[in-house]
């Protein structure tokens, strides 16, 4: 019986840890196509262990290096079977003095905290 209890403990620990480390949404790729009027279109690839409506990547955001939000792309449903996935957001106005932006992703359980990307803009 002790062996069964140990196996149960190991199995439940593994399940708990795997759910805990499903963790934050990561930005794995970003392309930015900017026009001369400081307006950019972004294609962002996000990876997250989506697990239905209770835990999924629900948005990504373009920010200045100082942390000011410039644009948010809401993700309206889980992508359980499509990982990583790419979504676009166009016509993002970039301040004239901004030459780099940070893109970060969020998930519905852990909020922000995963891998983010810094992107140099050619305007």
Q: PLM features: residue spans?
A:
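Short, surface-exposed binding/anchoring microloops in extracellular/periplasmic proteins
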Residues: 23-58
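A short, structured loop/turn motif at beta-sheet edges
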Residues: 34-38, 62-69, 93-99
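The feature marks short-to-medium sequence segments in extracytoplasmic or secretory-pathway proteins
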Residues: 46, 55-80
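Short, solvent-exposed, Trp/other aromatic-anchored flexible loops in extracytoplasmic proteins
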Residues: 71-100, 106-111
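Edge beta-strands of extracellular beta-sandwich domains
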Residues: 112-121
């Amino acid at each position: 019986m002790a062996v069964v209890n140990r196996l149960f403990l190991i199995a439940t620990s593994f399940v708990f840890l795997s759910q805990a480390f499903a963790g934050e949404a990561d930005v794995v790729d970003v392309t930015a196509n900017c026009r001369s009027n400081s307006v950019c279109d972004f294609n962002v690839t996000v990876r997250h262990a989506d697990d239905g409506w209770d835990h999924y990547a629900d948005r990504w955001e373009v920010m200045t290096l100082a942390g000011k939000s410039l644009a948010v792309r809401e993700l309206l449903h889980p992508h359980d079977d499509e990982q990583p996935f790419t979504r676009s957001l166009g016509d993002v106005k970039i301040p004239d003095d901004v030459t780099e932006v940070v893109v970060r992703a969020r998930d519905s359980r852990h909020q922000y905290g995963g891998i983010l990307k810094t992107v140099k803009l050619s305007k």
